[in-house]
Each structure stands twice: as structure tokens, then as C-alpha cells.
């Protein structure tokens, strides 16, 4: 039989891609080396964080799975930056790393149109620059209309501890070389990247009296807009400590022993998740660095030491760990390591995540040069959607930079490329006030429903929410608060100045000191906290949001101006030589994308626009 889509690898990108295609009623095959290890968390036991938490919400709005699985597996939930503006708020959860893969496997096994196969892919079947399927290591072949590669850090991977180098994937699992070599031979530009993970410490060997406990928020909040949970359950603590002067001395005295500084590492590491060696070398003026001790699972006697990623030899790791407060007698359960792996140059991808080199071949996740579970899952979802749309003969779904962080991520990758593991940051999004944690469903739910990933019941609840929000906005504008004794006493109780004449709730809530509680006091209803949160943001930031929307709309004419793929840039007059070279290499799909290419200036864009208009005249 010929499948509609084959997904190679069942990490965070692979499972989202497979579920998306299957939900689109397409015959889908997901191949992975070990079905008990789908969507594992080989590094940090957490999901979410700045920008990343919003990506998880976006995945959920589009009909993906990560948010629901995270809610079911969380052991601590926290809203980051709650006192700051809504543009930078984001959820972060500690995840039970044993439970999360089980939850995801259960979803995969119960999804219609999805077949799971435990096995190893050796190479792709490619004919006439078009992928036709895959060759398995056992000699069998499987054919499909599309193939999505989501191999994570397993392509040509090597584990590095000190000067020891082992051919292996994360946690001693198998690496794969066949696909990596084949991609190179097919004309893909390969990158060599590096990431790392810290040691894991026995939970019962830590003296917690020397740490600062870090609890969750203690309030019910979820990643999913339609969460399968109704309470958070037992919440674990994380713990904060700092490195000691001894830690710094141990590192500087042994830098040559590190894989990173001993010349063993070839790959480029992540700028925003440096090793502890990197932190001390790059920031010599800092005497200490934060370390967070985080639980890995309710059922594991292991704690994750965030901030202590290293490639030092094991005996140096022992010294480093025992130099930390509360870790004087700590036992290392698993040692830290660095891992090198192959990735492709993401500028060889279209915005749909289909490759420019081989037709019907899509790539998603760390193979595209990103870091992080959330970035991988977002790409996997989009690759699955667009592979499905291609099978259905429809246009790809391309999320714009003012629509989603996922859109920012993909646009950055395919336009600017990367020479190091790419991490999504709030600062990368110029329209971040539009891309908030609270409004992911408003931005993206319609797309998920139209494609077939969001069911009727879920969409109906979303429609009711929009109606409720509209009703509450009208109530806030029409409900007048008069200076009665009761109202004046209430305002005094929340440290707000008195009113001297009637004022609407909408106008009153423009006061910075008044929050959601005031809305609930003056506009009581049966609606949930989410409605009140969005109402508060609408009232307080309406002017700013409208301004951001107008600025985004100005750029829309460039984003919607498509550029033919066969255009000869060298024939266009008055464009700089550098711009011609960059445009010819990257082949931007829209004028908007062309504006973001390094080396393409405003004059070049203007001349390109003149050329396109003359050609269409």
C-alpha cells in the first residue's frame, strides 16, 4: 500500500506531524526505533517558558496535542512574568518525564488513520528529485506520497564527556547515519550542532535546608484551552541555589579537560543555553551563577540540575556538584554530557517546511537547526498540516509573523538560517503584543477548524467564548459606577482613589492599580477566569493593541505579495550585487520575506516591487 504520509521519528515534532495528518483523515505511518520512548524529554523536565509557553498554546489552538499532554503530566505550573505586561507572560510547567511519553503513546495508539511501526529507517527512496518512501534497515520498503523527517538529535550524533567521544544518541540510544549521508549526497547543506545536558542527582542525597524552595503558583491554570484536567493535583517544589567560589575554581582549573574547551567538540552550541564552563568563561566578572534543582518525575529519585550543563569528565563533574550548596554529599545518578549532531540548512526549506531540494519531503524539529521541545512540536504540527494539504491538492498554511510565534520561528529559520541551535525568544517577535498567551485561540482556532484538526464541539465552545467576551466588553462600556458609599469603600479597600461622578467600568479599569478582582466585583457573572483576563487586557491595552495591529497591517501588503519561484534576480536593474546573490540563493516566497534577508536593503526591495508590478502589468 502507499501511505499518504510517513513520519520518520517520534519525538515532539514527529508525534504532532503524525497526529495532524491522521486527523486530516489521511493514511499515516509513524516509524520510530522504540515505541515506549515516544515524545521523551531527554534534557530538561519542563515544557513552556518565555515565548515557548505561548507556542504550546498555539499548538493547542490549531488542534495539536502537546498542551493537553503537558497538562496531564505537569507536577508544577507557573505563570512567568505575571506582574509585567501581557506580551511577556507565559506558562511554564515541570513535567513528569515518565508520564508524558505514556500519555502521548496512548493518544497515538487511539488515533484513527494512524499506524505505528517500530523500526529503523536506513535511507529515503528518491526518484526524479521526489521522495517516494523509505528503506528500512530490515530490507523492507514503505511507500508514501509525502515523507516528514523528524529525527531530532539522532542524525550522526556523538556523545561527548571530557575527551571521550561515543557514537550514540541521547541517553545512550542508537544514532543513525544513513539518512544524514544521503541528505548530503542529495545536495543538502549540512550543519554540525551541539547541545548538552546537566547531571541528574539522587533526590535523597540533597540537603534542602541550604536551598530556596520555588513553589508553583498554586492557582489553576493550563496550557490547553480545553484542558482534560480540572485541578492541578499534587505540586512539586523546585529549589534555587548558586554556584560557590569553589565551583568557579574547579572549572577554570580544568578547562582543558572539557570537551568544549579541549578541542573535541566540532558542533556549534546554543547561545541561550550555555554550558557552565561557557558561563564562567564568557562572564568572567560574575562570581556565581543561578542553579535550579528540578524534579524529573514523581516516581524517580532524580533531580535535574538546571544551569549545570557540562561536558567535563566524570571525576570533575563529581567535584563540581559537591562544590554546590546542599550538594556536599550528593550522588550523581546520571552524568552530564554534550551531544553533537547533524542538521540541514533551514534556508533550503519553503515556508511550508517542504524542502527545496527534494519534492514532497518535509523536515521538522532539531534537524532544521532549532533547540527545544516546543519549537520542535510547533514545526512538526505545521509540517504535518502542510504535507496533508499537499496530498489533498490544497495550498499550504503559512502563519505570518503577526499571527503566531510559530510563524516567527519558521520565517526566521527559512529567511535568516542559523549557525547555532535556534531558540525562540520573545524579543524575536516584533508583533509580540498581538501574540499573547491569552489570545492564541482567537488568533488560530479558525485555521485548526478549517483544516480538520479541531472538532465541532471544541469549535462551538470557542464560538461561545467569543460571544461571552463581546458581551462582557459591552457590559463594561455600559455599566456605570456611581460614587455611593459602598463603591467608595470598595475603591478605598483596593487602594484606589475615590470617584466624584458616575464612571463606566471600562473607564474605571483603565486605572493601573485595578485588576481582575475589580471586574468580578462590578461585573459578576458565571464566566470563567479566562474571560475576565481577556477583558482586563482588552480594557488596559486596547489602544496599544490597536496601534500594533495598524503597524502589522502596513506590512501586510508586502507579506501578501508573492514572488515567482523562477524569477531571475540578476536580470533586475538597480538591485545591489549582494542582494541579487542573497535573493537568488534563498528564493523568498513573498516580498515581506525578502525584506528580512540580511544584505537586502530598502532600495533593493523597492526595485523588486517595481519589477514585479511591471511584469504583472
From Swiss-Prot:
Binding site for NAD(+): 269-283
Binding positions (FAD): 9-14, 121, 176, 366
Swiss-Prot/TrEMBL GO biological process terms: tRNA methylation; tRNA wobble uridine modification
Main location: cytoplasm
Cell location: Cytoplasm
Source organism: Acholeplasma laidlawii (strain PG-8A)
NCBIfam families reported in the protein's UniProt record: mnmG_gidA
Entry GO MF terms: flavin adenine dinucleotide binding
Protein name as annotated: tRNA uridine 5-carboxymethylaminomethyl modification enzyme MnmG
Superkingdom of the organism of origin: Bacteria
Known partners and oligomeric status: Homodimer. Heterotetramer of two MnmE and two MnmG subunits.
Cofactor(s) the protein requires to work: FAD
Record-linked Pfam families: GIDA, GIDA_C_1st, SAM_GIDA_C
Matching InterPro entries: FAD/NAD-bd_sf (IPR036188), GIDA_C_N (IPR049312), MnmG (IPR004416), MnmG-rel (IPR002218), MnmG-rel_CS (IPR020595), MnmG_C (IPR026904), MnmG_C_subdom (IPR047001), MnmG_C_subdom_sf (IPR044920)
Record bears the keyword DNA repair: no
Protein role: NAD-binding protein involved in the addition of a carboxymethylaminomethyl (cmnm) group at the wobble position (U34) of certain tRNAs, forming tRNA-cmnm(5)s(2)U34.
Any one Gene Ontology cellular component term annotated for this protein: cytosol
Family affiliation: Belongs to the MnmG family.
Keyword entries, A-Z: Cytoplasm, FAD, Flavoprotein, NAD, tRNA processing
SMART domains according to UniProt: GIDA_assoc_3
